[in-house]
From Swiss-Prot:
<comment type="similarity">
    <text>Belongs to the mycobacterial A85 antigen family.</text>
</comment>
<keyword id="KW-0012">Acyltransferase</keyword>
<dbReference type="InterPro" id="IPR000801">
    <property type="entry name" value="Esterase-like"/>
</dbReference>
<dbReference type="InterPro" id="IPR029058">
    <property type="entry name" value="AB_hydrolase_fold"/>
</dbReference>
<feature type="signal peptide">
    <location>
        <begin position="1"/>
        <end position="36"/>
    </location>
</feature>
<protein>
    <recommendedName>
        <fullName>MPT51 antigen</fullName>
    </recommendedName>
</protein>
<comment type="function">
    <text>May have a role in host tissue attachment, whereby ligands may include the serum protein fibronectin and small sugars.</text>
</comment>
<dbReference type="GO" id="GO:0005576">
    <property type="term" value="C:extracellular region"/>
</dbReference>
<keyword id="KW-0732">Signal</keyword>
<comment type="subunit">
    <text>Homodimer.</text>
</comment>
<dbReference type="Pfam" id="PF00756">
    <property type="entry name" value="Esterase"/>
</dbReference>
<dbReference type="GO" id="GO:0016747">
    <property type="term" value="F:acyltransferase activity, transferring groups other than amino-acyl groups"/>
</dbReference>
<keyword id="KW-0964">Secreted</keyword>
<dbReference type="InterPro" id="IPR050583">
    <property type="entry name" value="Mycobacterial_A85_antigen"/>
</dbReference>
<keyword id="KW-0808">Transferase</keyword>
């Protein structure tokens, strides 16, 4: 993997300035099918995907953190709710929590050749608009945090929809997908673990459209908008193989290359953790969510 060994040697934990948004008025209580930790199990319609999407929702304030699952995302309840313990971690912090399910092997993007995978439209438009209408949330000013494929999506959503998302957290994310060092790994993992031809996403990588969707290529947007960024990628390939589609090395390399790119374009509002502790799995991702919770609250509440 050309150039990867040099990149992986980059060890840094950079914590940079964080902007604090004005405090917001708390939401009144919401009605619904309450479950553990006080969250609701919603079915949110998606015209783009032609079906209703299961969403775990916990009311806490007008701004929310959207939690995006790994490649082996659960069908009905997000792994953030179960393995990630997110509702307990974020409860009582003055923010709402939004955790969609059913996005396995999708990268949470709009697929060119699969109408059932139009996740960017759902996450950036349909879901926030529905929550604004039905649950009284603010239409804009939210956070996106994801693990594995969700880490890619969190940075992409914040880069391309800055009004919607002012905070992006990537945990073991695949954040430079257009690189020839990594796109083959993503395609191989999608085929092996999901039985899916990833060329249906943005076409074959050599056609060039992968760059249109790449947060590495568009890191300047995150820098220009002063988006708060949190990136975690441990110095190990261990962890949840299924969640990482067996390609942890691509996550490691791309996260470190993203750091270099982000700094080169003037980014200065990021926290990057490339330490030796932890792994690429829920045993590390859940504590990372707790560690970044103060940053999330400071950025969106």
């Amino acid at each position: 993997m050309r150039g990867l060994s040099a990149v992986v040697r980059v060890l840094c934990v950079a914590a940079l300035a964080v902007g604090v948004f004005a405090a917001a008025v708390l939401l009144a209580g919401t009605a619904g099918n309450a479950k553990a930790a006080g969250y609701e199990s919603l079915m949110v319609p998606s015209n783009a995907m032609g079906r209703d999407i299961p969403v775990a929702f916990m009311a806490g304030g007008p701004h929310a953190v959207y939690l995006l699952d790994a490649f082996n995302a659960a069908l009905d309840v997000s792994n953030w709710v179960t393995a990630g313990n997110a509702m307990t971690t974020l409860g009582g912090r003055g923010i709402s929590v939004v955790a969609p399910a059913g996005g396995a092997y999708s990268m949470y993007t709009n697929w060119e050749n699969d109408g059932s995978k139009q996740w960017d439209t759902f996450l950036s438009s349909e879901l926030p608009d529905w929550l604004a209408t039905k649950r009284g949330l603010a239409p804009d000013g939210h956070a996106a945090v994801g693990a594995s494929q969700g880490g890619y999506a969190a940075l992409a959503l914040a880069a391309f929809h800055p009004d919607r998302f002012g905070f992006a957290g990537s945990l073991s994310g695949f954040v430079y997908p257009s690189s020839t060092n990594y796109n083959g790994a993503i395609l191989a993992g999608l085929q092996q673990f999901g039985g899916i031809d990833g060329n249906g996403m943005w076409g074959a990588p050599q056609l060039g459209r992968w760059k249109w969707h790449d947060p590495y290529v568009h890191a300047s947007l995150l820098a220009q908008n002063n988006t708060r960024v949190w990136v975690y990628s441990p110095m190990t390939m261990g962890g949840d193989i299924d969640a990482m589609i067996g390609q942890a090395v691509a996550s490691m390399g791309s996260s470190r290359e993203f750091y270099q790119q982000y700094r080169s374009v003037g980014g200065h509002n990021g926290h990057f953790d490339f330490s030796g502790g932890g792994d690429n799995g829920w045993g590390a991702w859940a504590p990372q969510l707790a560690a970044m919770s103060g940053d999330i609250v400071g950025a969106i509440r």
